[in-house]
Amino acid sequence: MATDGASCEPDLSRAPEDAAGAAAEAAKKEFDVDTLSKSELRMLLSVMEGELEARDLVIEALRARRREVFIQERYGRFNLNDPFLALQRDYEAGAGDKEKKPVCTNPLSILEAVMAHCKKMQERMSAQLAAAESRQKKLEMEKLQLQALEQEHKKLAARLEEERGKNKQVVLMLVKECKQLSGKVIEEAQKLEDIMAKLEEEKKKTNELEEELSTEKRRSTEMEAQMEKQLSEFDTEREQLRAKLNREEAHTTDLKEEIDKMKKMIEQLKRGSDSKPSLSLPRKTKDRCLVSISVGTEGTVTRSVACQTDLVTESADHMKKLPLTMPVKPSTGSPLVSANAKGSVCTSATMARPGIDRQPSHGDLIGASVPAFPPPSANRIEENGPSTGSTPDPTSSTPPLPSNAAPPTTQTPGIAPQNSQAPPIHSLHSPCANASLHPGLNPRIQAARFRFQGNANDPDQNGNTTQSPPSRDVSPTSRDNLVAKQLARNTVTQALSRFTSPQAGAPSRPGAPPTGDVGTHPPVGRTSLKTHGVARVDRGNPPPIPPKKPGLSQTPSPPHPQLKVIIDSSRASNTAAKVDNKTVASPPSSLPQGNRVINEENLPKSSSPQLPPKPSIDLTVAPAGCAVSALATSQVGAWPAATPGLNQPACSDSSLVIPTTIAFCSSINPVSASSCRPGASDSLLVTASGWSPSLTPLLMSGGPAPLAGRPTLLQQAAAQGNVTLLSMLLNEEGLDINYSCEDGHSALYSAAKNGHTDCVRLLLSAEAQVNAADKNGFTPLCAAAAQGHFECVELLIAYDANINHAADGGQTPLYLACKNGNKECIKLLLEAGTNRSVKTTDGWTPVHAAVDTGNVDSLKLLMYHRILARGNSFNEEGSESSVFDLDGGEESPEGISKPVVPADLINHANREGWTAAHIAASKGFKNCLEILCRHGGLEPERRDKCNRTVHDVATDDCKHLLENLNALKIPLRISVGEIEPSNYGSDDLECENTICALNIRKQTSWDDFSKAVSQALINHFQAISSDGWWSLEDVTCNNTTDSNIGLSARSIRSITLGNVPWSVGQSFTQSPWDFMRKNKAEHITVLLSGPQEGCLSSVTYASMIPLQMMQNYLRLVEQYHNVIFHGPEGSLQDYIVHQLALCLKHRQMTAGFSCEIVRAEVDAGFSKEQLLDLFISSACLIPVKQSPSKKKIIIILENLEKSSLSELLRDFLAPLENRSTESPCTFQKGNGMSECYYFHENCFLMGTIAKACLQGSDLLVQQHFRWVQLRWDGEPMQGLLQRFLRRKVVNKFKGQAPSPCDPVCKIVDWALSVWRQLNSCLARLGTPEALLGPKYFLSCPVVPGHAQVTVKWMSKLWNGVIAPRVQEAILSRASVKRQPGFGQTTAKRHPSQGQQAVVKAALSILLNKAVLHGCPLPRAELDQHTADFRGGSFPLSIVSSYNSCNKKKGESGAWRKVNTSPRRKSGRFSLPTWNKPDLSTEGMKNKTISQLNCNRNASLSKQKSLENDLSLTLNLDQRLSLGSDDEADLVKELQSMCSSKSESDISKIADSRDDIRMFDSSGNNRVLSATINNLRMPVSQKEVSPLSSHQTTECSNSKSKTELGVSRVKSFLPVPRSKVTQCSQNTKRSSSSSNTRQIEINNNSKEENWNLHKNEHLEKPNK
């Protein structure tokens, strides 16, 4: 083994050396690899791979033999028999590693060296090979690019040559145009110079006019000041005359007492001399009636001296005999109607004034002799009267009339031509007797209606007429003109009834057509023309032109006559019905044509001339509406110049006149073969078309072609749009126009596919099959819709093409139009009523198709375009604008209108489970996805077949959109800045109010945001100042920018977005959505302009006083310098004055003057000397020697009612009125020194008085000041509380106004009605001292869901404020006579028992009638709170039921005016202005009967115990009657208030007999029962009139001595019917003044005072 190992070692060591040597030699040579070819590189690569494989084999063999060789080499030479060698071996084994020496060379190291070298070579070779391959690829790519560039270079060179040629032509054309334009520029420059010269002249004229206008303004201001001064003088003179009148009346009263004494003496003498019985009760009644007539018709002095024995029977009988029906000159507006016709029937002519009647004229559409009654189903109600419907059979359409009304009269033919207006539906009948007031009317219309309606001479329900002489006549001839006046009143009443009477039938939307015209005429297409019941003509325009007259066409006439064809009547009618499916933008000039067409539709034959049948070709199919030569129309692709849209031929009498759309144009009508002459077609065609004979052979190719080739020629002509050839082919006999080629395309399909509208029209007129499908199932409509030829689509739809036809794949025309994004075609198909939910075989809907193409407009049309009702006129532009302006300046209609597609269609999934949202999100169509997300029914979490949602497949942008679907809702608040402290009456005014929440989307622009803020403010201002409960959505239709209180977007001072200031119209770099999120703006605050800016907008919003009135107050202060504000306590006088002072101060400071406000509170101890010191210290009073300063002083004197005005201001009146050094006044100071002073011109003096009116000596001050009266029943106080509480509710609901049925609205309305009813009752009781302003009710709590809180607050207000004031006023009235000099007199410190009972009765009545009445709480719950009210436990049996939830609209006109002497002038508080005539005869009947029975029962109550609470009150009346007349009058008034119904609800009560309490009396009450029966007769509403108080007081009649057990004389004479009606006329004639000063006392107060004086002084002698 050793020898073998030794022999093998050199061989093993030599092999690696040889390999290393070979590698070294190869390395030395190092041939260049880059120079090798591809084949050599491949060979080298194969050699290398072989060597690598051999190397691997060698390595494996060497590894296998390594161990064996190693062992043999190390241990092979040792033998066990040699110990020396063993020792040597052990020695080597025991030595260290460093000391060991290898016995032989290690082959492993040699092998590793070889392997390392081979690896290096392998890596180098692979790198070189990769570099070679990359270079080879680059080379090939560069070769290909070079070839492509060479080809492109050749193409570009060719194009360059072409473009050079074109550019040369363009340059030549531009040069010509430049020359032309330069000439035009010179002409325009000359024109401009002329215009500028004219403009300069106009400017000069304008400046002159402005100067004249300013001078006129100054003159008017001066004249106004003079007029105001004269008015103040007149007021003073009037007050003096009134005082004189009162003195005269007192003297008259004394004279009447003497007359009464003389009467009694005469009666005693008669009884002593004659034994005849006294006058019977009926005789007294008659005398009583005559007295009333004398009082009403004669003057003041005559009335004072009149007695009961004056006889004026002749005049009364004469008036009764006057005929009621008088001939009146007939007019076109109001023909005569029989005055004695029952039921108040109006003629068919509109009896209204031109200023009121805004109804369009329809007289030419309705026959003159046919009564125009609305059909029962025609329930259209418009604002001022509905349009007249069609004219069906009158016997079947006459509405049911009232039982007491005769059938309406028919308009005679003689009157018909005079009437240019059709009768409105609800002007045919006057309101019946029990018709109540329309709840939503203007108060002016209501007042005017009752002004002319409630007459005593009007016929009642039974047709009877009662007459009495007028109460007061202005002229001597008024008696003769009575009936004429009555007729005029009836006319105005009937005109007003159009606005006030309730409508018959349920109201429908104004745009709905009447349903009674179905079947009469086929509806015309939507060309802004309605049928007989819908056509409208504006007032003032001539009526529509009647049919069969020349000059009807709106299009120009052709230059030569055209050939016409007879239209088949059946096709005409069918086509007319088909036209209804589209909307057309029709100009107003098409109205007369539309009327003509409607009247001619049902004619059996056309009126066009009949020509030979063969050349029956009408080439007027060109859109221009005139004849086009055959040469112009025969060229392929030649489109003549046309206006947008399709126009009707000018002379076509047999077709619809639709200016912008051809509904049907029968220009070709195939004729039978028997009526054609062979061989005549060519020549006649040439003659008709205008060709020259030389062109005919070219077209006909030498003669007629065989029919076998004609269908192919027909296809070519239709596909190429050759109208002339197509018309020739269609006129040949035996030609199959429905022939289809190999692919199934017919001629109509080819024409529709290529958009040749004229060819389509020709083929359809030739009765080509409109629904013929090709081999794939596509019809011509499908082809036209897919290609976007909307005119062809319109024609095909008009010819009854199947709009829902589905091809073999399920594609409908709508699907194809959406797939190709053809907006106009989609719109036409939708208006035709196509089905949007048809699915294809793949489950795709049109919504999928629209979204797949990313067409936003198509998707919007599908989702939001509504299908209009047939026959209803609609403005196409309006509907289109409501669809497409989605992301424009205005808010998108998606925010205000709902999509028309259901949620199922939006969420429908196709075969893969993808919805439209999946497709939009996956393709990144963000706009389409956003539109889909606006649909409320979208399900974004719906998953497809792969369990993926829309968010899973969405792109990044769409994911962001889906993550931010919800828009930001930022509350918008209005701030009025700092409000002054509560001592100015502003403690209940709120600083900030939330009006709404703005929805800010990510796509919202700053312009949209500005418009949204402005619109929200305008809507809020309009909502809080409206008459009813509005929501912000209800106000959007209102286009007015100013509200009733005068606030608008111009009232804004600044706006802050969170804490960042912003102004309307300002834009930031970020969008509003990003801006709000980045700045974390939680609210938007709008600050209104206030006194600091010299404006009053914030004051208006804080106090709800209209801005115009505040500005008027400020103008009065600036103009007159001396202004006093007076009104009931709590009318915000102090707040108004202080805000006006602040505004005036800042205005003066802006003008450069220094200004100071000096405020002084006046109390009972405030003396004239203190006021003098105040004027001097504030530099208002300046010594004559001292020069005036430029400083402005504003002095405010508060609570002037606590002092005597005449004593406090007497010495200052003259110098205040004449402020100059020329009229000084000497004043004595406290130190005894006197000095001359005068008032500074720059001094403003304002005062406040918490008193409703001036009395006594205070009237002397009136003419020296400008007075502003804040009446509780007039603006601004009347609507202030309503607006304030409504704003409070809106703020509580965070800008969302609740519905009127909400409990919060009801409780707020109740609080408002409490204030109004309370003041009306207090005014009726004659206690103006107790009247309350709205300030106390501003703190009304608004707590949703807790109405009890408001009731508890009301109880605290009643106990703390209202009841003490009422008690003080009642005691001051029921105690001693009040002194005329000083406001309120103090009541007795220790009132008597009777006075206490009167106070309790008054509080109980006020509580039940004014406070608890109308409370929305349930009866059981309200009874629990009644005990909290002071005075609620006083027993009264006759009180108004307070469980009614009806809102009180106003109070009665029958106010109690109880002033019996000149010292009490409370009559001015007795006329509330919102709804005076709201009391019916029932109220009079209840009052009269109750008082008659009450007084009779009072005389019997001494022997009986108190049976009920009423008798208790009557005993109080009897007990108090022995003490004071005021107490007696007060108790009578309380009885009247108890016995009457609620004033607001009396007019709605038909008969309240059960509410009348009848008491047993003696047997001599026959006249009483007769009167009761007389009063219970049915009375029409025209007789319902406000009662003056003297009717009530006259009803408290006196008894005779034999019937009374007491010493006072009272009469039991009832008031006759004629007396009542006469009194109602007196009341109706009276009117309140509109002067801004104090409203004059009603004229009835004089007569009323006379009655009370008479009744009072009749009783004095018997005391």
From Swiss-Prot:
Judging by the UniProt lineage, the source's domain of life is Eukaryota
Question: What species is given as this protein's source?
Answer: Nomascus leucogenys (Northern white-cheeked gibbon)
Q: What PANTHER family does the database record attribute to this sequence?
A: CTTNBP2 N-TERMINAL-LIKE PROTEIN, FILAMIN/GPBP-INTERACTING PROTEIN
Instruction: Say if the entry is tagged with keyword Coiled coil.
Output: yes
InterPro entries for this protein: Ankyrin_rpt, Ankyrin_rpt-contain_sf, Cortactin-Actin_Reg, Cortactin-binding_p2_N
Signal peptide positions (record)? none
Location(s) in or outside the cell: Cytoplasm, Cell cortex; Cell projection, Dendritic spine
Phosphoserine modification sites are S1524
Question: Which terms are listed as keywords in the entry?
Answer: ANK repeat, Cell projection, Coiled coil, Cytoplasm, Methylation, Phosphoprotein, Repeat, Synapse
According to its UniProt entry, what is the function of this protein? Regulates the dendritic spine distribution of CTTN/cortactin in hippocampal neurons, and thus controls dendritic spinogenesis and dendritic spine maintenance. Associates with the striatin-interacting phosphatase and kinase (STRIPAK) core complex to regulate dendritic spine distribution of the STRIPAK complex in hippocampal neurons.
ANK repeat intervals: 709-739, 743-772, 776-805, 809-838, 842-871, 912-942
Renumbered to this chain, the Low complexity biased-composition regions fall at 384-396, 1624-1638
PROSITE patterns, alphabetized: ANK_REP_REGION, ANK_REPEAT
Q: Which gene encodes it?
A: CTTNBP2
* Taxonomic lineage of the native organism: Eukaryota, Metazoa, Chordata, Craniata, Vertebrata
Q: What is this protein called?
A: Cortactin-binding protein 2
A single GO CC term for this protein reads: actin cytoskeleton
The UniProt GO MF terms for this protein read:
protein phosphatase 2A binding
Tell me which SUPFAM superfamilies the record gives: Ankyrin repeat
Where is the stretch described as Disordered? 1-23, 203-222, 352-440, 454-478, 498-616, 876-897, 1446-1485, 1580-1602, 1615-1663
